From Swiss-Prot:
HAMAP family: PEPcase_type1. Its EC number is 4.1.1.31. One of its GO terms (molecular function) is magnesium ion binding. Gene3D superfamilies: Phosphoenolpyruvate/pyruvate domain. The gene is ppc. Keywords: Carbon dioxide fixation, Lyase, Magnesium. It comes from Vibrio vulnificus (strain YJ016). It catalyses: oxaloacetate + phosphate = phosphoenolpyruvate + hydrogencarbonate. This is Phosphoenolpyruvate carboxylase. InterPro entries: PEP_COase, PEP_COase_bac/pln-type, PEP_COase_Lys_AS, PEPCASE_His_AS, Pyrv/PenolPyrv_kinase-like_dom. Its cofactor is Mg(2+). GO terms for cellular component: cytosol. One of its GO terms (biological process) is oxaloacetate metabolic process. It comes from the Bacteria.
Amino acid sequence: MNEKYAALKSNVSMLGHLLGNTIQEAHGDEILEKVETIRKLSKSARAGNQADRNNLIEEIKSLPDEQLTPVARAFNQFLNLTNIAEQYHTISRHCDAHVCEPDAINTLFAKLGQNGINKLDTAQAIRELNIELVLTAHPTEITRRTMINKLVKINECLSKLELSDLSYKERHKTEKRLEQLIAQSWHSDVIRKQRPTPLDEAKWGFAVVENSLWEAVPDFLRELDEKLKDYLDQGLPIDARPVHFSSWMGGDRDGNPFVTHTVTREVLLLSRWKAADLYLKDINELISELSMTKCNDTVRQLAGEDEHEPYRAILKQLRTLLSDTKEILDAKINGQKLAVKAPLQSVEQLWDPLFACYQSLRECGMSMIAEGSLLDTLRRVKAFGVHLVRLDIRQESTRHADVLSELTRYLGIGDYNHWSEQDKIAFLTNELASKRPLLPRDWQPSEPVKEVLDTCKIIAAQSREAFGAYVISMAKTASDVLAVHLLLQESGCPYRMDVCPLFETLDDLNNAEAVIKQLMSIDLYRGFIQNHQMVMIGYSDSAKDAGVMAAGWAQYHAMEALVNVAEQEGIELTLFHGRGGTIGRGGAPAHAALLSQPPKSLKGGLRVTEQGEMIRFKLGLPDVAVNSFNMYASAILEANLLPPPEPKQEWRDLMEVLSQVSCEAYRSVVRGEPDFVPYFRQATPELELGKLPLGSRPAKRNPNGGVESLRAIPWIFSWSQNRLLLPAWLGAGEAIQYSIDKGHQALLEEMCREWPFFSTRLGMLEMVYLKCNSEISRYYDERLADKSLLPLGDRLRDQLQSDIKAVLNVENNENLMQSDPWGQESIRLRNIYIEPLNMLQAELLYRTRQAGVVSEELEEALMVTIAGIAAGMRNTG
């Protein structure tokens, strides 16, 4: 490995050595020697030694069944340890300029100064900064919570070992602890035995808040405050809330029959319980710290005239409030029917007394104390509120239409589902304006309809602060949005809820502007939304529908059109981005992705999903989370203060061509190639993936459908396992080569240099190409697919090689990712350990498919390879 990364190399080597010791102790020399042989052969094969590649294949084929699991686990664990070493390296003191970006906020301030941006404008933009990260439990978070906690502790050990002034005793103790943690990981289940319930997923989300975000938010705000004082001579307002969180865990019922209104209610209670629990820890710490006696009149009044330690007296009142709240919520979670409400209902109940203490300390000459733990708690109160994270509700559009269809049939006025869009809108607006209830008392709805209505009642019974948005998946029309407003109104919802259409397919993205325009033409609707509209842009389904190039342009187009509609109509627009970790689902480095969006599209702030495994990579450790917040904040500020250029008309025209050609190329394979579905099923572990106890959602929306009914996640996950990563590149390079052949190379090069949207697209493709491995993909084909399907695989791999040449040609680069040596190195480092897992997986798929009846031993080994490859590929789905 490059000497620039010596500290990382040293940590990876040390962790590998300790893992080797654990394997030797658990399984003896034979298994350790097998693992070492396979590792060395893999390294040699990577370097181009064909003989060793053949030896590697034979070595794996000859493994008896009982050795497959320990060997697979060895490489799986090694990849997890490599990930933790790499993640730690990005925040360690050894991290150099090749790896760590210079501080994102300071770099931005320098750039703003060079461009003559007024400091008052900068201060205003910072006051308006609004980053909302929406945590979602997508099934690609393969690593169990048990393992994640161990990995966090391993990280802490690496941090200690970096200190040069450790005594021999301290160093020895830390090394022993590290060895114990690695042994604990080895002897724990790598993967879950049962699918997590939606409740398990929600608890996983709360664990991320407790272990990382609770500390990261005040740390980030403290750092930002200091930078602002240096640059603007004014700090961050104490009540600023530039970053806050929502969640889909326990609220996302789209295609997930396990998320019921009962589950949602329980998650809401758990969320409040966890918030009270975390605040209680803060308050207990403050009680021990704030023993001062001097205070202002406000605190004296709150504490009582006779209290010698007034701050403690106020904090003890809060302690009682929080303890009582926990007790009542606990009883409700455990099914006790209590009429009494939990005492803590609003943020003000925490904020007002704490802020009074803060002001008093400052007024009495104790600013140093006020700016310590107390300020951190105040910042948390603003960021997390009394609900910890706000819950989004997501439901598919047809479920709402089915409620109205059943209702209108009962009322004898026809079938809502058979009405024209015009008639639906007339009915909905009429009912929204009506003072009488729509739902008859004697109506007995079917179970699916009752479930939708019960969910709306749960929303109506909570405060507005409990919820983020009501997201309508597969939204296509204005009536889809109005229907939800009507159902919420009929359920007695007393506040304005953000009802957010999610436009997912290519056609729906292209139609988004017309839908929002139509809604804005309805006066009654404008009154409902109180001048604010949220729209969600779907990345994964549009890419699955049309390929990444066409989907990317449709997303850009839709955002641009929606921004223009919002300006014309004088409404505030929040664009909600449904990105995943992979390119096929919109994943890109955050900073680049945000700066590649249309001008003005971040004016309403950023709302974006953080999904599955990306939560751990970007937010799983406090220091890593602070880096992520900095990156998001600097990108939003830059996009709003130094907006990207409006694309030239000739760029747009060429993008239209690229979009059309790439979509046709993508669909000609995925939809038009008769052998494609059998090839996909045989050459990837798609069928076996359905058995993996990942997320709580089924892998298909329709259990009997083909590729089109597959969720975007298993679709992409399957292709990342066999290293062809087809959905993340198919069609894009072909369209670029087509444009070069038509004489547009100079224009493509100009777009690459001057247009962030286009250069980011190519950068994302480069990363995908580097993660692809044609030899591995061919090995899967040869081992698993019918001979008649092999020519299709060869054609796809030939296309991949042509596409790589086309992209490098436009970028004038010789190698993939040459402008990002750290990213390049990071992928190469893991490849040595992923490839044996790929070989093992192909062998396991072969054995399980041949056997027909799968032994538990083989199934476990297969699951371990799936989890390991996902850990190695990083952005899995």
